[in-house]
C-alpha cells in the first residue's frame, strides 16, 4: 500500500460535506493499494447546456481524485496543491454515472503526477486526465 495517511471511505466521503464535491454528487467508492476511485452522476448538475457531460465536471472529478490521493501521500504538517490539470475528452455522455480511477505516475518529495481515467458505465474511456501537484510543508 502506498498511502501514508490511512482513511476509510466513510472518512474520505465526509471531507466532501458542504463542498463542490458534494454538490456534483461525487462519492469515493474504492481505495486500493495504489488506486482511488469515485463515481459522479451525469445529470443536470454535471451537464453542459446541450445535455451532455460538461468537460469541466470531468475535470472536477479528476482534480478531486488526484488532490485527495495526493493528500493521502503526505505526512502531518504537509499539504498538496494542484499545479496543472490536463484533460482529453474521448466520448460524450448524457446520462448515468461515470467512474474515475486515479493512480500515481510519479511520487516525489516535492511534486506528484496522477493519471485519472474517467469511464462510462460500460467501461469505455470517456476522458483521460493528468494532475500535477506540489507538496508543501
Curated annotation (Swiss-Prot):
Transmembrane segments: none annotated. GO terms for biological process: enterobactin biosynthetic process. It is found in: Cytoplasm. Its EC number is 3.1.2.-. Keywords: Cytoplasm, Hydrolase. Pathway: Siderophore biosynthesis; enterobactin biosynthesis. The keyword Cytoplasm applies. GO terms for cellular component: cytosol. GO terms for molecular function: 1,4-dihydroxy-2-naphthoyl-CoA thioesterase activity. It comes from the Bacteria. The active site is at residue 63. InterPro entries: HotDog_dom_sf (IPR029069), PAAI_dom (IPR003736), Thioesterase_EntH (IPR026576), Thioestr_dom (IPR006683). It is an enzyme of class 3 (hydrolase). Homotetramer. Dimer of dimers. Interacts specifically with the aryl carrier protein (ArCP) domain of EntB. PANTHER family: 1,4-DIHYDROXY-2-NAPHTHOYL-COA THIOESTERASE 1, PROOFREADING THIOESTERASE ENTH. Belongs to the thioesterase PaaI family. Required for optimal enterobactin synthesis. Acts as a proofreading enzyme that prevents EntB misacylation by hydrolyzing the thioester bound existing between EntB and wrongly charged molecules. This is Proofreading thioesterase EntH. It comes from Shigella sonnei (strain Ss046). The gene is entH.
